[in-house]
Amino acid sequence: MRQGLLVALLLGTCAAVSAQEATARRPEPNTRVPKGVQRYAPTGFPDRIVASPAQDAATGFSVAWRTDTKVDAPLLEIVVAGDSPDMGEPRRVTAISTLLKTENGSAHHHRADVDGLQPDTLYAWRVQGDRTWSAWHHTRTAAATTSPLTMLYFGDTQNKNVSLTTRVVREAMRHAPDAKLALYAGDLVSGGDGEDDNEWGEWFEANEVLPTSLVVAPAPGNHEYFEEFEDTPQERRVLGAHWPVTFALPGNGVAQAKKTTYWFDYQDLRVVVIDGTSALDLGTAKAQAAWLDQALGSNPHRWSIVMTHQPFFSPREGRDNVALRKHLLPVIRKHNVDLVLQGHDHVYGRLKSPPPVFVVSVTGAKQYRLSDEARRTMRPVAEDTQLFQVLHFEGPRLRYEARTATGRLYDAFDLVDEGGKGKQLVERTEGRIDERACTRAETLKGRADRCWE
């Protein structure tokens, strides 16, 4: 009897342990695509549609999209948007098509450049597939330099895009329904895991209507590159095949990093995108600095932003991007850049300094820990926090807000152009929540150097 009772107790204990193990939290994969399942195969229907600004965003923009290989040199149709379904005879632009082979099969990625548009005009446009078309999308061209502008800035998305980036993008669009431009500070996907195309599919799914409602300008991150000949004397960084075909970016970058650097004008703002990975790992920092000097030196506008993936002043322990500070930082200071927007370190930190204002942010699921140096030199800082940023330009005032995934205000300041006195930073503390710190000892994978992954 006792023996039977003991066996029953042991079986019950084992069953309870098994139940706990079955419901225990486990690390989530980067994509929701189960092994052996093909979720993002290209078809004759256009997908991964994204608009990006032309060099002059008042008179043009470009569109990239994807289909299967049956579609070659398809059309983009564009017309001034109207209230009737009959918007008139559209203009037709023929796209250039590029083949890309991935784990999801072969696809054609298309690019159409639209020029000759009228400023501050709402256009309707659609792209062609195999005997079919996309929906009609709306894009408004940039207005006069004196017009207000609202834009969004996202740090790294990178991991678990559909699972956890989606909610941040939705919250951002709720808080900035009038935004016309979105900047992404690199590492849009993780890559290098045999699921690169699945990850890009999830990035577009997570961003939903944003890439066809706003114009999108991304910076390349180190995860947009891969290591070729790894662990050999020939090891080197190589730009991934998706980057040049996924976005239709301005082709005005420095020759040594032509596909990953560019600039454009949007109303009273010039945005210059540099490639930190190329600067640090491929020796192009000096060339990029000379090009940046020209791009900023010819800026006729009141405002300027430089965006790069790797920070000039890193808030994460153990990272120090010396080549950026040596070659590119003097150019940024010389031209009195207003904002330097960065990612890479998966925390939030704003350097305590007058303009230029250096900001590092993160949108995605991967969360690192702050260094002691960052806690001394940056304010505010944050760990374990998904964020988006809203920037509003109106005349002599730039208003910046960093908000959490639930929309709570985390950081806010104004830059005010006082004419001869230059740009002055005005802190806005009302309504901000308290600084956030990671309270977990380690991640689900047992890593103490990260807060979440």
Model regions and ranges:
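Bacterial N-terminal signal peptides
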Residues: 4-14
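Acidic, histidine-bearing metal-coordination/catalytic regions of metal-dependent phosphoesterases
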Residues: 19-153, 174-177, 384, 390-453
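Acidic/histidine-rich helix-loop elements
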Residues: 82-109, 152-167, 190-192, 234-237, ...
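Extended active-site neighborhood of metal-dependent phosphoesterases/phosphodiesterases
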Residues: 111-113, 122-138, 198-300, 319, ...
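Active-site metal-binding loops of divalent metal-dependent hydrolases
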Residues: 129, 154-159, 186-188, 222-223, ...
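Active-site-proximal beta-strand elements of phosphoester/diester hydrolases
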Residues: 148-158, 268-278, 305-309, 356-363, ...
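Conserved, compact domain cores that house catalytic/ligand-binding motifs in diverse enzymes
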Residues: 149-219, 224-225
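Short acidic, glycine-rich surface-loop motifs adjacent to enzyme active sites
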Residues: 185, 189, 299-316
